[in-house]
UniProtKB/Swiss-Prot annotation:
Residues 1-26 form the signal peptide. Glycans are attached at P74. It comes from the Eukaryota. It comes from Arabidopsis thaliana (Mouse-ear cress). Belongs to the CLV3/ESR signal peptide family. This is CLAVATA3/ESR (CLE)-related protein 14. InterPro entries: CLE14-like (IPR055317). Keywords: Developmental protein, Differentiation, Glycoprotein, Hydroxylation, Secreted, Signal. GO terms for cellular component: apoplast. GO terms for biological process: cell-cell signaling involved in cell fate commitment; cellular response to phosphate starvation; maintenance of root meristem identity; phloem development; regulation of cell differentiation; regulation of leaf senescence; regulation of reactive oxygen species metabolic process. GO terms for molecular function: receptor serine/threonine kinase binding; signaling receptor binding.
Length: 80
């Protein structure tokens, strides 16, 4: 019976300590962002940054890929 009373008193003391810690930190909350502020932070500005294109290079503006030169002649990998 003595062990039960010691455990019970320890449990009650721990509950009071944890409740005190919780109530003391409840007043310190970080300021939350409003939904408008969060949307503005996460929104996309709509601008695309494309690389500079010179007149001598062929460039596909839709896909943003350059037309590279393909080697002409027989492919040595297929000549086995």
């Amino acid at each position: 019976m003595k062990v039960w009373s010691q455990r019970l008193s320890f449990l009650i003391v721990m509950i009071f300590i944890l409740a005190g810690l919780h109530s003391s930190s409840a007043g310190r909350k970080l300021p939350s962002m409003t939904t408008t502020e969060e949307f503005q932070r996460l929104s996309f500005d709509g601008k695309r940054i494309l690389s500079e294109v010179t007149a001598d290079k062929k460039y596909d503006r839709i896909y943003g890929a350059s037309a590279r030169l393909v080697p002409k002649g027989p492919n040595p990998l297929h000549n086995k």
